Every structure is written in C-alpha cells, then in structure tokens.
Amino acid sequence: MLDLVNAQSPYGFADPALVATYPQQAAKAVPGYHDVHTMASVLLAELAPEDARVLVLGAGGGLETKALATAHPDWTFLAVDPSAAMLDLAMTTLGPLASRTSVHEGFVGDAPDGPFDAATALLLLHLLDREERLRTLADVHRRLRPGAPLVVMHVSYPQGDPAERELWLGRHEAYLVASGVEPAHVEKAGTMLRQHMPTLNPDEDRAVLEEAGFTGVTQFFSAFTFRGWIGYA
C-alpha cells in the first residue's frame, strides 16, 4: 500500500526489499489491520466445518493465513498469489503452521478446483479493475461449496463527487502520517490512489460480488477508505 507501488513489477510485489517490509507497512496503512483477520476468522467459522479447506487469495505475507491457522487448528489452506517472493514470505511467516498450507503461484483461475469450504481476499480486489474483479470473484465462486463464505476487504470509498473523494483521500493520508509513515511515502501512496488504483465505490463493490454469484452480501467493516464484506456461494 505504500512503497509497494513503486517498483517495476505491479505494485512492487517482486522487489525483495519491499516484500520484506510488507507486513509492517500494511499494518500502518490499514486501520484495524490485525482486527480484520480476527473478524474474518469469526465470520468464516460461522459456517465452515472444523476441518475446513480454505482458499486464501492474495496470500503473500501470510498474516491472515497465520491468524486463521492459529485460531482453527484443523483447517488447511491453499495460498494463492502471483508473486513467488510474497508466497515465500507467507511460508516464512507461518513457520510450523506452514505444514497445513499449500501454495499456488499464479491466479485463482488456474488454481485447483477445490471444492473449498471458505475463502478470503484481503487487500486484493482494489488492485483489479471491475472486469478483472468480476472474473476473479466468479473463479472463486466456482471453487466454493454451495453456501460457503467469502470474506473480502480492500480500498472502497465514494467516487462520484470529486470533493467527497478528495475528503476521504485526505483522511487516509492523515491517518498514515499519524501512524508514523514518512511524508515522502504518504505522498507516493496518495499519487497511487489518485492515479493508478481502480477503486470502486462501496455500492459497486457489493454489486460485483452479487454479479459473481454471491448472496447475502453484508458489510462488516468500515475504516476510512477501507471496507469489508462477507458473502456466500
């Protein structure tokens, strides 16, 4: 979310130096970052069986997988990410919990079919335009058992009125400063959000989830420019 956007590869996820600091940067950039992992664990457990197979999209870094694996000792995971460096970081982060996690370097459309009992996509979908989001979510839906939960969380805030959009971006930048992020990095993050990130407004995000086949879509999280939803296959 910060310097991760400044390397040659998309969003910097192949730059070893930036990958190494991703967990710390994400925790500073996203209000309630670790709490979202706890909420995802609670929400998925409402319907997932004790021995659930969980599909984790954008799994690089490994912190959400670690939180889920710690809370649910009989769950197993497929971690999907196009960045080999991020998957390596995830397995390092997991430590002994890695024995319950397999990895797929690539995209969900060419990942194993499952079926899976639950899925997450945290801090992922805001990197994709609407068409790519819909295709990705449809690929997830096809891999889930009927009724299985999906938890998503990403950048999503009002886009229609330029003044309102700028208000939310300013709040996000102020939060980064208050979290101790260096001013130069805050400026780069602002440029990325304004010029490069294909952000949707919350109503559009919900509509894409429903168009992909998910039902009962409910927002469970809102913090400045971030929103989270749960839906069911």
Model-derived segments and spans:
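N-terminal, positively charged/glycine-rich alpha-helical extensions of SAM-dependent methyltransferases
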Residues: 1-21
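Conserved alpha-helix/loop element of class I SAM-dependent methyltransferases that forms part
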Residues: 32-50
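Class I SAM-dependent methyltransferase SAM/SAH-binding core
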Residues: 53-57, 61-110
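A short acidic, Gly/Pro-enriched loop at the edge of an enzyme's catalytic core
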Residues: 111-119
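A short glycine-rich, Lys/Arg-flanked "PGG" loop and its adjoining helix->strand segment in the class I
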Residues: 134-146
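Conserved class I S-adenosyl-L-methionine
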Residues: 149-178
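Short alpha-helix
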Residues: 195-212
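Core SAM-dependent methyltransferase catalytic element
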Residues: 212-233
